[in-house]
Amino acid sequence: ALALLVLDHAALLVEALQEEYKAHFLYASVLEAYPGAMPFATIAESELRHVEALQKLFTRRQMAPPASVWTAASFDPFASIQAACAGGVKAETEDADFYAPYLKLDDLPQDVRSVFTNLQAASLYNHLPAFERCQ
C-alpha cells in the first residue's frame, strides 16, 4: 500500500506541475500578443516560481520533474486584453479548484500540502483579484 501511495502522490505532483506550466504558458501567449501587458507579465513570472516550488518536491523525492506538455502556441489568441483578463479569471479559478480536493486528503505529505496551500492561495488572493480588476 505504501508504494501505491507514493505512486499516487507522484502522479499528483505531475498533474500539479502540468497545471502550473499551463497557467504560465497561457499568460506567455497573452504576452506574445500584448507585450508587457499587466498583470500578465508579473503573473507569468509568478507561475514560474510555482513551477520551481513543485520541481523542488520532485527533487526531494529523487524524481525527475517532467517537461511541460504546454507551450505558448497551445493557446488560441484572445481577441482583446479584456478577453485575456477574463481568460485569466477562468484559469486562476480552475487552478484554485484543482488544489481543493487534494488539500482534503489525510495522507498528503506535509511538504506537498504546504506547497499546494501556497499555490492555491496565490491563485485565490493574488492572481484572481488582479485579473478580475482588468476585465
Regions found by a protein language model. Name each.
Residues 1-135:
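All-alpha RGS (Regulator of G-protein Signaling) helical domain and cognate RGS-like helical scaffolds
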